[in-house]
């Protein structure tokens, strides 16, 4: 029977009737109903970044479930991304302390990667897809990565990819990991959308496929409150990764982690050790069946992630927003849409009726004549400054139509999807402006021009 030490401690505390002369200020009462379970680091409650008691026991339960050392984050995968990049920097500085570390990164990274590169003074070499592609996707093959590493003037501290990506494409993690290890570097994976991959009948989790470290947003696909996430470390990673994981998380994390989220992660262990894998397998089959039915109906689907349905909207005669509005009218709320795609995320917490209702709603949308639209494809902007220098420069916000030739200071993209079209330090060209305008970005933050 899987234990839940964090929940058990807090339930006992709630029943004790103790006078709360500690934070938080609500003292366990309030309008929302969950305040009694919201505590701080009192005696016995442990401390997330110095865990030795109930939190450590819960993390050990998670480690057993994932088959590798696992550490909790109450600040999403963003915290775990910064932490694993910091650990890669530590490992690289042991070899070459004199130079800023270099990371090869697939271009469709989350903007947290860019901010981490600025904070950690990382040089980035971007990996692009071999043929065009949407800014949300960047399929890097093992062959292309091997060629890039072979041609590199210096060995990178790590290779960083996003898999699954926002559109549901899963990379060849095993192939990429093999290339990285043969070339003497590490593979880090932003697996924010794929925590559930470990619990499929055959695991597709990055650490099981050879990644040295990855982050999972537990809250995205598991029964966990928003903000709950994991940092996973492979047993084959450099020793500094496990030894320094808590230090890395503490460097970027809040000193007030949410005990509500920690309880949610604790409860998830019991779910994952119980009926979750069977329910996941059943829902994956239902999702695949719906995908086949939609394709037979004429919809164009993309991606191979088992718990995500991504429809290319243009061939049906709509924008992604147009399809999303039809779903909203049917009482269905999708994860994401843009001018080209509609993304829907499914989990075992959905019901069979939910899937049937989604299928009926989509198939009731009449097909229209597809318009001939030339999509602006992301280019390869030229960098004028290092990421850190651009982020730390005086900056101003200007309309995108006036931005050609200026240097981007901030990545200028919301969440979702939080994937930048241009990156800090790059010169904004006409193609970037077309992309900004196409995706509804009306202004951007650029470095200030200094007179004289």
How should each PLM-predicted stretch be described?
Residues 103, 362, 437-452:
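Surface-exposed interaction regions enriched in Ser/Thr/Asp/Glu
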Residues 70-71, 124, 334:
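Generic structural signal for residues in well-ordered beta-strands
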Residues 1-53, 185:
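N-terminal "arm"/small-domain region of PLP-dependent enzymes with the aminotransferase-like
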Residues 69-70, 99-103, 421:
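Short active-site oxyanion
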Residues 292-441:
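Conserved C-terminal alpha-helix-loop-beta "cap" of PLP-dependent enzymes
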